[in-house]
């Protein structure tokens, strides 16, 4: 019945949502966001972590309004359509760790699943390895699903619990308004800002926040999720979410061609490196973490807007992972992956396998 009452949850709805996200990403790039990074939840989360002082990497510090918009837009949709249902309590510490690991893997690759497709749509051939890694990581996750993997059931919670993340995001919007970036100043009040590098590149506040709000609203209604698209095809042979991802890529490719932002090649791509093995491995780690957590980083933010505190814990893990990645030198750069990052990929994969096996009933874990 839900599919009948939700006009967005149709093939046309998911195609439109994917297309709008792809076009919005390219336009945000045109208006100032970094190259092939018009929208990237991992990279933008890293910038947010830097802006509030969780790491001191000076080139990636900016309070990205798109992130707050995703949660607040989804919150508005959930309220309007009576889908704001506060819940949580499903292995919160595990979800926090999954969030940290997902961010570390994404920063080894230099992008979340959304940026995999945006890099491809911008002509970055290195993202092919990332796409293969993402698919491989999600496929590994489906092996655990077949064995009964579960983090336990979420429980209904008081309204106050579900309001925490939207209120936090509203507070961050207020901070961005009252403490805007000041030319040639690395700090304004409570917030840090990059003077060069990706963090210094951003679209105007109104456009960024507006795009985030609109995307959050649409994605909440359609359940847009890049990880879910791959999972559903592998497990159930269902293409609903995949249609949205394909529309996202197709629209971004078309927009980049029209805007002159398509630059095919492997070297000199913006905020990217050409080490294929580590592009692949980083996204295997990220993809498996997203699968075990139940959604890509964008989907997790949209769930925060619905009052899901488990998704909120995962989002906090993303911020912590960004801080660790830059404070400990795990994040890659255009020059390539660091030695610490290489070790981190192996350690993170081992932790993910441990979580997967110990949460499968057939392996002695809890259902």
Regions from the language model: what does each represent?
Residues 1-367:
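Membrane-interfacial helix-loop segments of redox and metal-homeostasis proteins
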């Amino acid at each position: 019945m839900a599919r009948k009452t939700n006009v967005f949850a149709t093939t046309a709805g998911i195609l439109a949502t994917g297309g709008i996200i792809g076009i919005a990403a390219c336009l945000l790039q045109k208006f100032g966001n970094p190259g092939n990074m018009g929208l990237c939840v991992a990279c933008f989360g890293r910038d947010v972590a830097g802006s509030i002082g969780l790491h001191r990497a000076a080139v990636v510090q900016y309070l990205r309004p798109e992130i707050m918009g995703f949660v607040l837009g989804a919150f508005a949709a959930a309220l309007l359509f009576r889908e704001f249902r506060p819940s949580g309590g499903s292995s919160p510490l595990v979800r926090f760790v999954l969030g940290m690991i997902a961010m570390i893997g994404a920063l080894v690759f230099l992008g979340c699943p959304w940026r995999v497709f945006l890099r491809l749509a911008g002509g970055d051939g290195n993202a092919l390895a990332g796409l293969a890694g993402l698919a491989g990581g999600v496929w590994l996750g489906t092996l655990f699903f077949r064995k009964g993997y579960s983090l336990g059931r979420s429980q209904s919670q008081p309204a106050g619990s579900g309001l925490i993340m939207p209120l936090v995001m509203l507070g961050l919007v207020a901070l961005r308004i009252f403490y805007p970036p000041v030319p040639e100043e690395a700090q304004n009040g409570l917030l840090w800002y990059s003077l060069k590098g990706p963090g210094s590149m951003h679209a105007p506040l109104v456009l960024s926040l507006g795009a985030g709000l609109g995307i959050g609203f649409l994605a909440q209604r359609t359940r847009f999720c890049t990880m879910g698209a791959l999972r559903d095809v592998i497990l159930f042979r269902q293409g609903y979410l995949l249609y949205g991802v394909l529309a996202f890529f197709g629209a971004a490719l078309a927009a980049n061609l029209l805007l002159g932002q398509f630059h095919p090649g492997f070297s000199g791509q913006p905020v990217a490196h050409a080490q294929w093995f580590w592009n692949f491995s980083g996204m295997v780690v990220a993809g498996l973490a997203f699968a075990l957590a139940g959604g890509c980083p964008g989907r997790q933010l949209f769930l925060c807007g619905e009052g899901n505190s488990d998704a909120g814990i995962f989002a906090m893990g993303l911020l912590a992972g960004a801080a660790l990645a830059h404070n400990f030198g795990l994040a890659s750069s255009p020059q390539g992956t660091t030695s610490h990052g290489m070790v981190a990929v192996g350690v993170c994969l081992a932790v993910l396998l441990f979580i997967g096996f110990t949460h499968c009933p057939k392996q002695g874990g809890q259902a």
